[in-house]
């Protein structure tokens, strides 16, 4: 299994994140993207494994109109700056994913400019789809060409031309060699030639077998793109829609149907880890889409617990709102200040996502387990995931009142690792009493790992002193935590400290 199969992704739209100017006027680069370094402790607290950077290559407008595949957009900074960012992220155990906009380029792309200047004498006429000199473009060029989706500021590349493919693949090799990037997200992957994907997969996997290849696909059979010859994963737009609409419509049958269709018994995408999300740079923020903000934590519990790779769009962990309005995506791609979010954002939601990140890392069945519906009602959903002899149950209640769910289990006792609440099992029967707008992740109560830890972190009297067995820490609430032993996580080998609350006797690891 590769690293990305167990990863939590964090998606940033760099030009918006940094507050860069809307239009690239040239001039000296400004190292705005260094701002991301200040977010590293935040990313680590969320258990993020990789940052997926939206477009960072040189462009004139929004980043999807590339002019140079080997240069960082001067509004974001320099190549040297980005190399430093990659190094620091890697030092902190965070991988780097770049946005590959390889279906089209901007009108200022160097080869297109050559065609504009030299006409039919340009050696690059065959680099662009549908280019011919029998007409004129909407911009007044003395030739016609294909624009992506009718946008003629986005010039479609001819990916059947191997010289074009070579140029793009060599650019990817440059970022792999010089910056040690760990993956590519392919923009508009449904428009890209399949042979190009096969070539770039062979190239990238030959250099780095665990290099992640993910494509933006909105409609269609995901297996056409996500398969052993092409991409590792694609965007799961089917379940993106199902997550929010199931809550807005109070109809869990919808999302349960989609997940079962994809990953249940006989599911059509078993063996493929799809890229799951609840919002991104192209769609309204989840907090603006939901009819009730109390659904937010339920949506994220579902996204982290369902099969696939969970991804969080920057700021949405704090309930940031944003809509596509007046034919503009600016509201979806704001400049955000982390300190402001930590002061005035939805802190309960953020703490919930931090907890989900810990739980996701602690229980392999959440990451790789099968999917089986146990109970589905309009307003309640309970499913189980099994992996290597372990079972996890996930329960959701979107009702504005309490709700009970009864089911059978082979486990002798359960605990909800979100709240820490023990759940009684009587002769194999369980009654789960759920609060309004709540979610639970139930595991066998004999599992002890760092997901069960309280939200607060021990404050050592002498922080420079290494933690040792027998150390005692006084907490703000008056409780005393004692270090009973040191251990290593069985999968990640992460160093863990085993604590015991001296009053309650509860034990956990962090």
Task: Mark where each language-model region is.
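Substrate-binding/active-site clefts of carbohydrate-active enzymes
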Residues: 2-8, 13-49, 56-178, 200-206, ...
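Conserved, mostly hydrophobic/aromatic
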Residues: 12, 43, 53, 69, ...
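Mixed-charge, low-complexity intrinsically disordered regions
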Residues: 458-510
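Active-site-proximal helices and loops of the catalytic beta/alpha 8
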Residues: 116, 177, 187-269, 302, ...
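Hydrophobic faces of well-ordered beta-strands that scaffold small-molecule active sites
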Residues: 8-11, 51-53, 96-98, 184, ...
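Carbohydrate-interacting/catalytic domains
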Residues: 1-52, 58, 83, 88-89, ...
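Active-site clefts of carbohydrate-active enzymes
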Residues: 268-291
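Short, well-ordered coil/turn segments that N-cap beta-strands
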Residues: 6, 47-49, 92-94, 180-182, ...
